[in-house]
Amino acid sequence: MSSMAGDLGFIGVSTQHSLIQKLFPLWVDVLGLGEAKLRGFDHPPGVSLADMRLQVEQLRGDSSLAGALVTTHKVVVWECAKGLFSESDSHAQRLHEVSCISRNSEGELVAHAKDPLTARWAINQIVSPEHWQRFPEAEVLILGAGGAGLALAWVLLDSNEKPARIHLTEVEAGRGSQVRDHLKEFSQELWSLHEINSPEEADLILAKLPPQSLIVNASGLGKDRPGSPLSTSADFPSECHIWEFNYRGSLEFLHQALRQQRKQRLHIHDGWEYFLAGWAYIIAEVYHFELTEPLFAKLREAALPLRPIH
């Protein structure tokens, strides 16, 4: 790859505190991206549409930026700047969000929503598609119906091999209509939205899951905010697969599962590989290379010294 690859923008809230600041230089060496740097652009939650549009306009006009990754402000970028993109992929159009900004051969901006791609890759590392054939009664509980949780639900529903049912929980009042709109193409015999007010209500859904089900913390709790979407009294069903989307933070949900791992014979996964894949797919899009399994293995190996220990 070219030593003139350009820098990668990072549009977030507190970009200097992200582990990617240490990881990106290691990956630049693996990928042969020369002098490419990571440049953070911080905006508070609730940033105005005008300010974010100005940010995207600045990115468009700065030819030294090859593209950008967007974290917290995915929906805002779409709302304020969709007219600034010469192209938008099908996921960005469907989800009305942007997690990756690249440039085409003319230098024009292209919008991508990469969460579905990352979710599809990650879920196949945790449970194989054959899992739902082997355990046809197994279900999925996604605790949190935000962007990442919704992307996972969509990927599972869009697959040839599906769980018996997918449950999504949502505590944010008024978000239910958005969730239903995103999943409207799928039969409601396959999924349920539970609009809940407390962790104890989530416990009740958890208690009814069959063995070999998948339980996912997509709530954001345990990362930037302490807590778990389940109460401290929650009991995981036996032989379930537990997926904590987060890889850092207080990780209460993960520790709940670890305490029950031996007794309930749980299969537990944190969000480390999901984090790596999310960044790797976006870097591949921005710098226009194919992310093969052997290449991802090299990136995973380079990142290993930075992995937090739980």
Place the predicted regions along the sequence by residue.
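Rossmann-fold NAD(P)-binding glycine/threonine-rich loop
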Residues: C100-R103, G222-L295
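Short, conserved loop/helix-junction motifs that constitute active-site signature segments
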Residues: S2-S3, R134-P136, S159-E161, K208-P210, ...
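NAD(P)-binding Rossmann-fold cofactor-contacting core
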Residues: E161-L190
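Rossmann-like NAD(P)-binding element
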Residues: R60, R175, P199-L230
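Short glycine-/small-residue-rich Rossmann-like dinucleotide-binding loops
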Residues: T72-H73, N217-L221, N246-Y247
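Phosphate/diphosphate ligand-binding glycine-rich loop within oxidoreductases
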Residues: S3-H131, G249
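Glycine-rich adenosine-cofactor-binding loop
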Residues: G12-S14, A111-P116, I123, V127, ...
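Short beta-strand element of Class I
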Residues: L38, P163-H167, C240
